[in-house]
C-alpha cells in the first residue's frame, strides 16, 4: 500500500491579525505545520506535497527537504489548492491523505486509523468526521437512510435540516489518488462562496456509484482548525494537557499540572518532581529524580539525575548529576556544571565550565571561565571578562579558594590550591599553593569618628 499526503498551507489567516502565515503560529513550541507534518509521518507517505502561497519562503523553510512544494498563487478554495498538487501526484497508484496545516491537534494514531479504515472498506474516498455539540460553521455530513455518506454541505449552503446535523467534516480526507485528480477536473465554483470546494468530489463519486465512507474521531478536540487567536489558545490548552498527561503516565509527578508549560520536544525521565509554574522549552531533558521547584524556567538544556533547581532560569546549559541551582540563579548559554556543583542564590554563570563539587553560593558572576573541582567561590565574586571590545577567560584551578568580594580581571589564571583574600582585585597570575592579596592595608585612626558630624557627641 502506497500512501501520499497533501498538506494545505497556502492561506494567509486574516483572522489571526498577524504578519506571520497562519500555519507558522506555534503551539507548545512547534509551528502548527510542524505538528501536522509529524502526525502525517505516521502513515509513512511515499511523497508529501505541501501547498504554499502567502509568504511561501517562510513556510517552505520550516519543512525544508522533508516535503515537495507547490505554489497556489490565488486562494480559490480547498479544491483549487489540491489541484495544485496534481503536477506532483497525477497518475500515481495509491491513497492520498489531504489535511489542513492549521489542525495541530490531529494525532498520528488517528491518521493511521483513517488510512486503515479507508483501505479495509475499499473506499474511493473516506472523510474524517467528528460529532460536534455546536456544529455551526462546519461542513455537515449528510447520510442516507442506510447510513452511507451522500454529500458534504458547507454551512452557507446548508438547508434548515442540514444545519441541524451534528456530524461535521474535519477537513481531512483520504482518496484514491488517481480518482481524486480525475474528479477535481469536474468540480465548479457554483456555490455561495464562489470557490472550488474539495467536498464536491464526494457527490461526483456518489454519482458514479463509487464508495464513500466516513471515519468518526473519538476525540472532537483533534478536529480543531485554528483560524484566530482564540482557537490558538484553545489548541495550546489541549496540547499542554496532553503533554503533561503523557509525562505523568511515564512516571513524572506534577504538583499543579494546570500551571506548568512544557513544550513538545522536552523529554523527562521517571521520578521527576515538578512543582507549579515551571516552564520547560525547546530540546530540554530532565534526568531521573530531579526536582524543579516553583517558578523554574529551563530552555534547551540537559539536566542530569538527582538535581534540584529552585526558582531559577537555565538556558542552553548542561548539568551533571547531583547539581543544585538556586534560588534565583541564572545559568546562561554555554554553561556546563559537573557533578555535585552548587550554584546558589543570585549567582549568574555564562559560557563557563565548572568542575565537580565546586560551590558558588551567593551573589556571584562567573563568565567565560574554566573553574576546577572543589573550588569555593566566595560571595560577591566577579569575573571581569569584558574590556569593552573583547571577552577574556578566567582559569581557576582545583581546590582554589576565592575570597568574598574578589574581583578577578581576565585574562587571569589562578593555580590549584591557591587563595585570594577577601576584597581583593586580582589581575595577575596566582601560582599553585599561593595566596594573593590585592587590597589596600587597613588604616585605623582611633577617636577620629568623634570629629565627624554624625557622631552623637556633636549634637550636644
UniProtKB/Swiss-Prot annotation:
The record's cofactor note says: Binds 1 Mg(2+) ion per subunit.
Write out the residues that bind acetyl-CoA: 379, 385-386, 404, 422, 439
Q: Does the keyword Magnesium apply?
A: yes
The region called N-acetyltransferase is annotated at 251-460
Q: Where is the active site?
A: 362
The protein's matches in SUPFAM superfamilies, at most eight in alphabetical order, are given as: Nucleotide-diphospho-sugar transferases, Trimeric LpxA-like enzymes
By its UniProt entry, which Gene3D superfamilies does this protein fall under? Hexapeptide repeat proteins (2.160.10.10), Spore Coat Polysaccharide Biosynthesis Protein SpsA, Chain A (3.90.550.10)
Q: What is its EC number?
A: 2.7.7.23, 2.3.1.157
Q: Name one GO biological process term.
A: UDP-N-acetylglucosamine biosynthetic process
Q: Where is this region: Pyrophosphorylase?
A: 1-229
InterPro entries, alphabetically? Bifunctional_GlmU, GlmU-like, GlmU_C_LbH, Hexapep, NTP_transferase_dom, Nucleotide-diphossugar_trans, Trimer_LpxA-like_sf
Please give the function described in this protein's UniProt entry.
Answer: Catalyzes the last two sequential reactions in the de novo biosynthetic pathway for UDP-N-acetylglucosamine (UDP-GlcNAc). The C-terminal domain catalyzes the transfer of acetyl group from acetyl coenzyme A to glucosamine-1-phosphate (GlcN-1-P) to produce N-acetylglucosamine-1-phosphate (GlcNAc-1-P), which is converted into UDP-GlcNAc by the transfer of uridine 5-monophosphate (from uridine 5-triphosphate), a reaction catalyzed by the N-terminal domain.
UniProt pathway: Nucleotide-sugar biosynthesis; UDP-N-acetyl-alpha-D-glucosamine biosynthesis; N-acetyl-alpha-D-glucosamine 1-phosphate from alpha-D-glucosamine 6-phosphate (route II): step 2/2; Nucleotide-sugar biosynthesis; UDP-N-acetyl-alpha-D-glucosamine biosynthesis; UDP-N-acetyl-alpha-D-glucosamine from N-acetyl-alpha-D-glucosamine 1-phosphate: step 1/1; Bacterial outer membrane biogenesis; LPS lipid A biosynthesis
The protein's organism comes out as: Streptococcus pyogenes serotype M6 (strain ATCC BAA-946 / MGAS10394)
Q: Which UniProt keywords apply?
A: Acyltransferase, Cell shape, Cell wall biogenesis/degradation, Cytoplasm, Magnesium, Metal-binding, Multifunctional enzyme, Nucleotidyltransferase, Peptidoglycan synthesis, Repeat, Transferase
State what protein this is by name. Bifunctional protein GlmU
Q: How the protein assembles, per its UniProt entry?
A: Homotrimer.
Q: Which domain of life does the protein's organism represent?
A: Bacteria
